[in-house]
């Protein structure tokens, strides 16, 4: 069983990594192709392409200029500790023990606009390139066309090597669109997290993102290899709702949070 997650725009570059083990991204040669083109963009072009402020555009122009291989622990950081959004706050990998970190490395993959598909301990250098960005490139008009079948093929190889036939999709639609589900050789399960608000259950983005990270943490802490065991996920008040679920979409609900 493998999980796929989205990356995060917010990055934690400063805090030291709690583990020394690292791996290298499998698709780094592809990243270098993209980065050569990204480096050609002036800050104003980055601002327009990514719809960000001048300050963020300048930061990322500087990141692009500084980006270089080979990646080492001195100039890069393991992806699961670099990404710093809601999903990763829910996962809170910094407080997992060594065995649990190894679980992440063996069962979790992170989708990325620049790096394609990452293991949690793959070294990465800071960047900003969301998968949905309309970044025209050598292979097409956007990143979905750039990556083509590359991410799906690597996922299939990863699943086959592990003898796994289940992929749990905890990524956003923007990122999971980079996976060709018709060519994916695995059973696909998509957990959906709904919170009660004013008596109705619906997806609330912040809570849903955090819950995705919490589910990965739950799996790591319980060393889960059987997908059915994920139905016992109960962190922070969530509970599996069988009536609202089907074979491929598993719905977890939580009663309204009393502030």
UniProtKB/Swiss-Prot annotation:
Q: Which InterPro entries match?
A: YaaA (IPR005583)
Q: Name one Pfam family in it.
A: H2O2_YaaD
Family under the similarity heading: Belongs to the UPF0246 family.
What organism is recorded for this protein? Neisseria gonorrhoeae (strain ATCC 700825 / FA 1090)
- Disulfide-bond pairs as recorded: none
List, in alphabetical order, the GO biological process terms annotated in this UniProt record: response to hydroperoxide
GO cellular component terms given for this protein = cytosol
**Which PANTHER family does the UniProt record give?**
PEROXIDE STRESS RESISTANCE PROTEIN YAAA, PEROXIDE STRESS RESPONSE PROTEIN YAAA
Name of this chain's protein = UPF0246 protein NGO_0461
């Amino acid at each position: 069983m493998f999980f796929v997650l989205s990356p995060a725009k917010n990055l934690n570059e400063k805090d030291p990594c709690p583990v020394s083990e690292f791996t290298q991204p499998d698709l780094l040669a592809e990243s270098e192709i993209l980065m050569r083109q990204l480096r050609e963009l002036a800050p104003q072009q980055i601002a327009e392409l990514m719809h960000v402020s001048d300050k963020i555009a300048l930061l990322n122009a500087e990141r692009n200029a500084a980006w270089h291989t080979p990646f080492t622990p001195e100039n890069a950081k393991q992806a699961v500790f670099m990404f710093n959004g809601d999903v990763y706050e829910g996962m809170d990998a910094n407080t997992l023990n060594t065995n649990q970190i190894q679980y992440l490395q063996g069962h979790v993959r992170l989708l990325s606009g620049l790096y394609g598909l990452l293991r949690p301990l793959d070294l990465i250098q800071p960047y900003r390139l969301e998968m949905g960005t309309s970044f025209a490139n050598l292979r097409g008009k956007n990143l979905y066309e750039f990556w083509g079948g590359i991410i799906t093929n690597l996922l299939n190889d990863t699943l086959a090597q592990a003898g796994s036939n289940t992929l749990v999709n905890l990524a956003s639609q923007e990122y999971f669109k980079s996976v060709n589900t018709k060519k994916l050789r695995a059973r696909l399960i998509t957990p959906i997290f709904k919170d009660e608000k004013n008596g109705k259950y619906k997806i609330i983005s912040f809570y849903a993102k955090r819950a995705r990270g919490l589910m990965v943490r739950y799996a790591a802490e319980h060393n889960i290899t059987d997908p059915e065991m994920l139905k016992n996920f109960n962190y922070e008040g969530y509970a599996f709702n069988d009536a609202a679920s089907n074979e491929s979409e598993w719905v977890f609900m939580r009663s309204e949070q009393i502030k």
